[in-house]
Amino acid sequence: MKNNKLTLSRVVFPLLFLFSLPSVSYSQDLKIIPAGKVKNIVLVHGAFVDASIWRNVIIDLQRSGYNPVAVQLPMDSLKNDIKATQQVLDRENGPVILVGYSYGGMPVTQVGTDPKVKGLVYFAAMAPKVGQSINDLLDRNAPGLPGQKAVEISKDGYYWLNPSLFGMALADDAPKDIVNAMSVSQKPIAVETFSEKVTQAAWKDKLSWYAVSSEDKIVPVSLERHMAKEIGATTIELKTAHAAPLSQPENVAAFISQAATSVQ
């Protein structure tokens, strides 16, 4: 399969805003809160990875009395990813906290309008408005980020990460053996998903939480802060690269637990 390097004239993850927006707090070493009334947690992964990115988060949540389940996205279209997320949500009994990492914020924003969902949690995730796509959130004319160097497009229309640059782009602070394994088992995402728009925005009516990855090299940190402010989220910053579920699973689980114990 022949791959072509992604150029700045195409859809990339550049710097959207040149100014910085304040977050509520900067947090490290959060403490997980044991499960209360809301125990069900639905986890939605991002591009280039599959549901296994949540492995250690799931373990921590289970140990604290939660019932986590991870969605496996097909990533051949946003429409099908929304369907896959809804299928998992439909199997849940009782209230749910819906969690999205990176691209996973797109289906979370759409599916989160379901009455079962009591809160939304975003980790360096897309948080679009109604009628927005990922393309709409990103500025293709701004300077690029280092993680762009890893992104390639296959001739059949999928984004991939160059395995040798996978860690640099997503998780240069995560355990190297885990990152190396994920780089050769990555899941590509169809280019067309970046132009598909959400038709609902659950954060308008649901409580939301947002964890900014302050050392992100593939999604602009300023964009994350902007989205968090736009949706009115309770916001923290984690000193980590893009893939917090890999590098800081304990903090990710703890932040989810804060959301779960804050809703009724």
Regions found by a protein language model. Name each.
Residues K2-F13:
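Bacterial N-terminal signal peptides that target proteins for export
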Residues V99-G104, V108:
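Gly/Ala-rich beta-loop-alpha elbow adjacent to hydrolase catalytic centers
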Residues K116-V117, V121-P163, A190-F194:
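Flexible "cap/lid" loop of the alpha/beta hydrolase fold
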